[in-house]
Amino acid sequence: MKLTPEMLTGKSREHLVNLPTTHSSNHFLQTQAVQAFQALQQSAAKNGFNLQPASSFRDFERQQLIWNSKFKGERKVHDDAGKALDLNQLDDWQKCQAILRWSALLRLVVIIGERKWIFLILIFCHEVNLYNWSLGNMKKAATSLN
């Protein structure tokens, strides 16, 4: 399927399917990404991990709401160490930089059609065993997307 500008900017969901999970029915991915994620989940389960999605596709309106809430200080924005920032101390450009510190990569994943979502696992792997397991399975999972 050729991705349209509407798909790439979160204005359309026609290229997405629901990712069934036990915790939420609000995760949407492209068909190939669902298949790859489910294969990764099965592999993780065999190795003792309960791998669940933390985030997935967000439409434009939802992403705009999140951005605006952060910019206005209604939602927390964190520094590199994960400590909440006082946005009242920042000018508008600094606020944008602070928000993008944790948001840019996630939005980029949606923009490029979610074909690279698998690499996000490295960002969220704070446990050494899960990190090592994910490194070992990255190439295999990425290959299944092709």
From Swiss-Prot:
UniProt GO molecular function: peptidase activity
UniProt cross-references to Pfam families, sorted A to Z: VanY
InterPro entries per UniProt: Bact_PeptidoProc_Enz, Hedgehog_sig/DD-Pept_Zn-bd_sf, Pept_M15B
GO terms for biological process, alphabetical: proteolysis
Protein name per its UniProtKB record: Uncharacterized protein HI_0101
